[in-house]
């Protein structure tokens, strides 16, 4: 039977259509996915992300351990509360998961990992942490609410006490701070500003209700997916998995190649891939009628006249832009246009960078 987050009852009270999402009963929408999407782009919306896994790591060798575990380098994290995004790779360079890591003190870091990959992530982390003497605490006592949109921070701040407001004042993106019962982070999965707020399970329902009263719109998985796709953000199992290199998933920027003597899991495989080349992730835009869908083939002819085929990893109608967009994994050599096979029609598409909307504005 699917698990329920501490906010399950609040979702039903708000009229949510609930679905099983990787073993969790989660809201798909609360009546209109489109309205929820627009609320985040123009005002403020919120998502229950309590199904994600928060993992606290403690020990004198925690930084050393994470420098080995992750492709990005936590040596960059020197200010308490600073976070970074990284892939956690296997020995062949495939992506076990993508995650956020927070630095608090030399012996205390926090990971936030995906729900669908929870068990394999915890197994992998535990296996590799043992030689470093790391104490691992899975924070199942915490719920998490993502409040996103141009007015999200101001509306959320109406629920904060003076100390909490002071703690987040002027906080830059990709930082987190513990302020009373709330862990407040300037992170998100929408391409908008906002907070991801972790708090004790028993306080989550009251906090959710207070956000509703503050004018923050409840949003479901449907809007979360169209928002992240417009923002060009990867979804695990679609843009990447254990067989796909981060170099083929627009995650090259998350690999810290320097210092050259840092050994991390997957490094040797990645260096070979970098030398020989990989596929790459691009954006596709189709302004004609129709919708680009996952797994549709993408065909193009390179400058030498050779024909190639890639695949759409995520596709949807963009509510913000009013036409169809997609992320696609394709061979090197693609130009500015390609063809997507939709049923029996060959549809022309424009090839772009894999990001379409940032802070409510079109960039594709």
Curated annotation (Swiss-Prot):
GO BP terms: namely: glycine decarboxylation via glycine cleavage system
What are the record keywords, sorted? Aminotransferase, Transferase
Coiled coil spans: none
GO CC annotations, alphabetized: cytosol; glycine cleavage complex
Q: Could you tell me the EC number(s) of this protein?
A: 2.1.2.10
Asked whether the keyword Protein biosynthesis is assigned, the reply is no
Under the heading Pfam families, the entry gives: GCV_T, GCV_T_C
Catalytic function, reaction form: N(6)-[(R)-S(8)-aminomethyldihydrolipoyl]-L-lysyl-[protein] + (6S)-5,6,7,8-tetrahydrofolate = N(6)-[(R)-dihydrolipoyl]-L-lysyl-[protein] + (6R)-5,10-methylene-5,6,7,8-tetrahydrofolate + NH4(+)
Enzyme class, one word?
transferase
Q: Name one GO molecular function term.
A: transaminase activity
Task performed by this protein = The glycine cleavage system catalyzes the degradation of glycine.
Q: What assembly does the database describe for this protein?
A: The glycine cleavage system is composed of four proteins: P, T, L and H.
Q: State the family named in the UniProt similarity comment for this chain.
A: Belongs to the GcvT family.
NCBIfam families xrefs: gcvT, PRK00389.1
According to UniProt, the name of this protein is Aminomethyltransferase
Species per Swiss-Prot/TrEMBL record: Escherichia coli O81 (strain ED1a)
């Amino acid at each position: 039977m699917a698990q329920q987050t501490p906010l399950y009852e609040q979702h039903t009270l708000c009229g949510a259509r609930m679905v099983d999402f990787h073993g969790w009963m989660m809201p798909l929408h609360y009546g209109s996915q489109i309205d929820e999407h627009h609320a985040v782009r123009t005002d403020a919306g919120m998502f229950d992300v309590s199904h994600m896994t928060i993992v606290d790591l403690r020990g004198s060798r925690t930084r050393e351990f994470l420098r080995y575990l992750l492709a990005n380098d936590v040596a960059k994290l020197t200010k308490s509360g600073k976070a970074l995004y990284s892939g956690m790779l296997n020995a062949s360079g495939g992506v076990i998961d993508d995650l956020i890591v927070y630095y608090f003190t030399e012996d205390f870091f926090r990971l936030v990992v995906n729900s669908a990959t929870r068990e394999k992530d915890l197994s992998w982390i535990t296996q590799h942490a043992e030689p470093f003497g790391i104490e691992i605490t899975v924070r199942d006592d915490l719920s998490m609410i993502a409040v996103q949109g141009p007015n999200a921070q101001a509306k959320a701040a109406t629920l904060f006490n003076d100390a909490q407001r002071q703690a987040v004042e002027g906080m830059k993106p990709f930082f987190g701070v513990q302020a009373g019962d709330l862990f407040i982070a300037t992170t998100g999965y929408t391409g908008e500003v906002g907070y991801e707020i972790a708090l004790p399970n028993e306080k989550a329902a009251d906090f959710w209700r207070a956000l509703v009263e503050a004018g923050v719109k409840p949003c479901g998985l449907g809007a979360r997916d169209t928002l992240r796709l417009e923002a060009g953000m990867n979804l695990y199992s679609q843009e990447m998995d254990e067989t796909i290199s981060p170099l083929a998933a627009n995650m090259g920027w998350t690999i810290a190649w320097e210092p050259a003597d840092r050994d991390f899991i997957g490094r040797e495989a990645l260096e070979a891939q970098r030398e020989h080349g990989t596929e790459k992730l691009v954006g596709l835009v189709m302004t004609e009628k129709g919708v680009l869908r996952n797994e549709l083939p993408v065909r193009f002819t390179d400058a030498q006249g050779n024909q190639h085929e890639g695949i759409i990893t995520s596709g949807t109608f963009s509510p913000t832009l009013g036409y169809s967009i997609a992320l696609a994994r394709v061979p090197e050599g693609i130009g500015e246009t390609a063809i997507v096979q939709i049923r029996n029609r060959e549809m022309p598409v424009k090839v772009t960078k894999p990001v379409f909307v940032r802070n409510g504005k079109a960039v594709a």
